[in-house]
Amino acid sequence: MSIAPEGRRLLRIEARNSTTPIEKKPPWIKIRAKMGSEYTELHALVKREGLHTVCQEAGCPNIYECWEDREATFLIGGDQCTRRCDFCQIATGKPAALDRGEPLRVAESVRTMGLKYATVTGVARDDLDDGGAWLYAETVRKIHELNPGTGVELLIPDFNADPDLLAEVFSSRPEVLAHNIETVPRIFKRIRPGFRYERSLEVITRAREAGLVTKSNLILGMGETREEISQAMRDLYEAGCDLLTITQYLRPSRLHHPVDRWVKPEEFVELGREAEEIGFAGVMSGPLVRSSYRAGRLYRQAIERRKADAKS
């Protein structure tokens, strides 16, 4: 294999990855579809109105639970990212021109779907002078404007930890500001060459200093050790991270990083307990957990924790 599906030549790392066949999933990696009344109603509405969510387009295994809670995730900034992470299925390339009407359309979709909580994520836009900071901030502002009772979780790139760009994003006051470190320092550069571990921690620290509830994610099965996971959790907590999700890496294609190991469910339980002992206000840990899984519930846990801390 020397040509990518979109017709370009493979990167050297993609060619190396492609020599490893797609791994067989263990029996505990299963999607259990439970279609409740809220999910059924929302699914019909999304289809009827022609709306687009990451939940459907990425085939998220948690769509049944999240939609039952009236929660959904939206991708902004286009479908081409200016950076390439070795686990991510979003294409890397030259993005289309900035669509300044997108924030309003997303907000209208949130209103049409009657969402209680919306997660907004997006691609890195290093081609723009502001890295897309206005787009992220304006999307939060429009959602709040059109949906006063809806919570918004904003999952952002690092904006190179530029204080002015981060301030622009933070000023939109999302209920939760998320930035995912995804993996441990030893393999970080290979997995996320466009990012830096310490810089990602700095983003979380700055968000916490701005008074926001903060969140991050760790993906397991890409070559890290158990000790490194524990240290990464401590690094996040010390950086000011309130909420943490821990998940299993599922390889999108042969061009992506091979799965190093399948983490057993009991290890996820142990890691969840360890994270709670470290002090995180809310933790979701499991093979099919994703960073936006039960996002509204985790946010409420963080608020309750802050209230309790204020009283003590």
From Swiss-Prot:
UniProt keyword Membrane present: no
Segments forming domain Radical SAM core: 67-281
Keyword Nuclease recorded: no
Positions with a binding annotation for [4Fe-4S] cluster 1: 55, 60, 66, 292
Gene3D superfamilies, per the entry: Aldolase class I (3.20.20.70)
Enzyme Commission code: 2.8.1.8
Family annotation (Pfam families): Radical_SAM
Lineage: Bacteria, Bacillati, Actinomycetota, Actinomycetes, Streptosporangiales
Main location: cytoplasm
Positions annotated to bind [4Fe-4S] cluster 2: 81, 85, 88
Transmembrane segments: none
Cofactor: [4Fe-4S] cluster
Subcellular location field: Cytoplasm
Name listed for the protein in its UniProt record: Lipoyl synthase
